[in-house]
From Swiss-Prot:
Belongs to the asfivirus F1055L family. This is Putative helicase/primase complex protein. Induction: Expressed in the early phase of the viral replicative cycle. Coiled coil: none annotated. It comes from African swine fever virus (isolate Tick/Malawi/Lil 20-1/1983). Residues 1031-1057, 1082-1102 are annotated as: Disordered. GO terms for biological process: DNA replication. The lineage of its organism: Viruses, Varidnaviria, Bamfordvirae, Nucleocytoviricota, Pokkesviricetes. Gene3D superfamilies: P-loop containing nucleotide triphosphate hydrolases (3.40.50.300). The keyword Zinc does not apply. Keywords: DNA replication, Early protein. GO terms for molecular function: ATP binding; DNA replication origin binding. May be involved in DNA replication. InterPro entries: P-loop_NTPase (IPR027417), Replication_origin-bd (IPR003450).
Amino acid sequence: MQETFKFLRSNSQGEAVEDKYSLETLKNHFVIRDEYNNLFRVFSGRDDFWKWEAAQPFEQKCFHEVVFGFLPQRLKFDIDFPVNKSYSNDNVDDNVDDNVYNILDMIINVIMDVFYETYSLPYNINLTREQILLTDSIGLNKKRELKYSFHIILYTYSVLNNNEAKAFTSKVLENLPKHIYPFVDPQVNKSIQNFRIIGSHKKGSMRVKMFNEELADVFETSMTTKKSDTLISTPFETTCLPCILTNVKETTSSSCDSIQQSELEEVLKFAGTLCKNHCFLRVYKNLVLFKRTSPSYCEICKRMHDKDNTLILRVTGNKVYQHCRHDNKHSLLMGSLSGTNNFVETYVEQVMSKSIEVHESILFEELPDTQKHIYDESSMREYERVPTLVVKAQMKIGKTIQLRNYLQKYYGNDSISKQQTIRFVTFRQIFSKNIQTRLPNFTLYSEVTGDLDSYERVIIQVESLFRLTSTAEPVDLLILDEVESIFNQFNSGLHKYFAPSFAIFMWMLETANHVICLDANLGNRTYNILQRFRGDVPIFFHWNQYQKAQNDMYYFTSSREIWLNNLLKDLLEDKKIVIPTNSLMEARLLQTFIQKKFPEKKIGFYSSKSSAHERESHFNNVSYYWGLIDILIYTPTISAGVSYEDKRFDVLYGFFNNMSCDVETCCQMLGRVRELKSKCYKICLQGKQNYFPETIEDIEMFTLQKRDTLFQTISNHQLSFTYCKETGRPIYYKTPYYHLWLETMRIQHLSKNHFITRFINQVADTGAKVFILTGEKLETVKQYTSIKMEIKHQDYVNVASAETIDANKALQIKQNLKEGITVDQRDLFAYEKYKLLEFYAWHGNKITPKFVEQYNSFMTKQNYTGRVQISRGKTVYESLTMLQTQELNFHQWAMQHAEHHDLQFNYSFQSHMYAIMLLTKCGFKCVQDPNILTNEQLMTKLVDEFVQYDLSAVSFEFKLKKPNKMDPQTILKFINKVLGLRYGLKIHHNKGNYYIKNTKAGSLIPFVRQPIKQSPCVVSNLLPITESSSTKEEISSTKEETYSTKEETYSTKEETCSIKEEISPIKEETCSIKEEISPIKEETCSIKEETSSIKEETFTET
């Protein structure tokens, strides 16, 4: 039985469905739209409709189900692919069917992922592909062109109404890749929705909506052919899903925090052996999804799964859990992410259980068999005579002995090649001297003056390569021992004559008849450099896999207290201890701490603070000097080239963090004492989570982007950019140093992002056994911390009370430090004082220890520089343009004269541009805007400007974690981190209002209109921003610490604030010494007083 109507909604003519039926009575009827006859038909039930439909002629079957929004309904998706369009993201696949199917598969996966997050995790409601119904209407359109259309229906579930369906659909659309989003119709959940019925087609088209068994087989979706399963208005047999609009609290918990790219590598390691049957698919919010490659046993369900992508890893807080789509009541804890208190211990457990692959394959291993010699023996085999030989083996297996045999065989007294030129390049002076003792027929560069080219066999350190010259004939043999460290040294910033040194190095590398590279920690950087610059000759890889460290035992912890108390116990038992650390402050702390507790013990202490004379004399005779001591403490000052062979020391205690040198250098430090009686190493690892770009592509993009913005014109309103007509787009010259620099940055960033996992992996890969260091947490740490404060305070006192020197003496001290000449400790403090006074233009003023503590800090200096740069002009936009011009001029000079200056320079324009953009989007006009925003005003701004805004570029620039959620409070927290780093400002909340306020560091360096005598300040040229009359009184009562409110016009004297930012393009000292940076930023200070890229707070590590 049916009734027909011309209209759906009432039009007062009695011809509409609404005229006869109420919404309540329609619940028990089935309504369709007859497109062919332009009518609405109301049936008493679905069965009546199907009987009637079967009797209609094919050309008139143009029926659409009318879905009323207030009624329960199935979740549905309308997918439509336009004709004559390529659907692959990279446009590489010409097979349209495959492209369409690949995209359709991706859409189904995203639907399942959103369902899992929305319903499976909180409510344990599962969705499999067999519960998804897929129909198609593929065929020719009116223009005789092939068109693809699909409907996806979750036929076993229903939602309460169209608003719930709309909310779920929106979540799916948010998580689709941008190139797929347009194919999904977002408007299929209206309050009254027409949805085509199975077996029907559009009027004038022969594309019929139908079941497709072949399609269901491809996508493993439901094989049902039951017509009622395709209807949207649901019968009672479906399961009604919980409401996601009313249960917001349950579905927006912290578990939805997204996984950062830099965290993904750690998360994937927890998959371990699971990846034998699965491969990584993608990340969805806080879920890592996998694609099944073969059947596997599920530890959660305790049975085999042979289809469906069941494996999911979920990250909640710092915990990583394993889930199965078939059972959401249970999960397995896999471990914890780095940057957390127990991550070290958790990760060691994973390594001990062999569920993590510790070996990091390198590109050399992928060379064909004819280009590699791999074996496992306790001593080295003879080296091959090939143009490019690369040797990898652990320490103490005889690499140098076999090299000596190689030289004797091919370059010995009886060899016809004895007159040919050999250059042995090292990365440290002390290593050069060590090598000469083993190769006495070589000339050491430091023992001769003048021309080195006349010597056939020369051992030379990289920073002295300028003493060589290129000739018509290439060198016959170039030896690069510790090759990875040699590449690192070119980024040290210590080269006095960088350009000629690097040019000679590249000339030898490219033209030498034979090259031998040796390193125990060989990596992809060496492979890529050799391929790029010696690609015309094949590489031969000689690898002895023998694990000499298989009897060594490493005990790891993240607890300083446990580590310290183990150390104290061993000292009480009168054991001889070795303590390497990559933190100067930690080394000084340990020295003082041990001296106070064990005054009778003799301590050897070596750092860059040690005098040049002491280092040279002791390192050349460690057998004698280290034989006199009970405890040896050293920083990266001691690395390769210094080796103690005697069995004197019992155990090694290492303390390392990710704020200093890379993992490879730290591991090298462990081997300076070759023989430990106990073969026991106890290591404390600490490191916060960092977010540095870690692929060559990302680093290059980030580097070029910072320079790219220098060529653009700033819009005063929305900080948009266009390219300057005068300068055009920049042209980048990708020189050999550029490629080496990119490779080195990649390694440094990997260490900063994944320091703990890479450290443990590299140790375990040597064959050493790894364990968790256990013990009690006693009160020792309080005394330790107290000593730390004493050391820091004494340093402040020493600087404040040091002699006040002039610029000439400061320059002399600086030159002595660069040239390795011993500088008296008093002069070092005087030089530190001079730099501090010079930085703030504070000469002639008396300073106190408190002044040194506050103003010699990393954050205060960074904020001061930022404030000076942004307040030069009358507006922030004028200031940005001035800074842009200054940095553009430097960049253009550097690209023409000395590229390494450009790559090592810290361009700050882009960081200012982002910071000001964030501030203005919040509704403030500049850094000195005194106005107040109400809570409603700011929240509205944050929603309108940022909820759909991608903050990836900003987080990339400031090395901050991208916000997990884009709600107003999370966005504001992120913005305040940026403003705090750049200017020492924050958007502060008080009594329902928001205004700009100083941070603790920012309050030390106020913006003023005229210089003040009380403290360093920033004389700002920014024109005053007029306060709104309604907020003046509030500002005066709540912002007493903020900006001066004098009415005088800002001084326009640029010379007052142009102190330190003007970087001279001829200065070679752009990079600070990277050695021994403390993990606590207050504890170190760079010698780069000319730049704003100060790394730490306290004293120069030279």
